[in-house]
Regions:
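C-terminal interaction segment
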Residues: 1-43, 47-97
């Protein structure tokens, strides 16, 4: 996978990841949501998760055509049992442990 600078410059990697997990920060939040997310959707990445460590929260999206649809939003100690792209249970508050 390409690093952020290469992806921003428009270079293309071979293949598409099954999952992108983007850690939000105040400095890059707008870029992550309004630039990075649509780029991965256009590339065909089936799963995109946004992680907000400040809340803490996880918002998961699944590809529907060429855009993402939100499939889950969990905060704090609330568990989420993801099925795709693989089975895993996530508790946002425990991401900081």
């Amino acid at each position: 996978m390409l690093d952020q600078r290469e992806w921003t410059l428009g270079m293309v990697a071979d293949g598409v990841p099954e999952l992108v997990i983007e850690i939000l920060s105040p400095n890059t939040r707008l870029v992550d949501v309004f630039l990075t997310m649509p780029r991965f959707a256009r590339a065909g990445c089936p799963s995109f998760w946004l992680v907000n460590l400040e809340m803490p929260a996880v918002t998961a999206y699944a590809l529907d055509g060429d855009t993402y649809c939100q499939i889950a939003h969990v905060t704090g100690e609330q568990p989420w049992a993801a099925v795709l792209p693989f089975a895993v249970t996530i508790v946002p508050a425990r991401l900081l442990d």
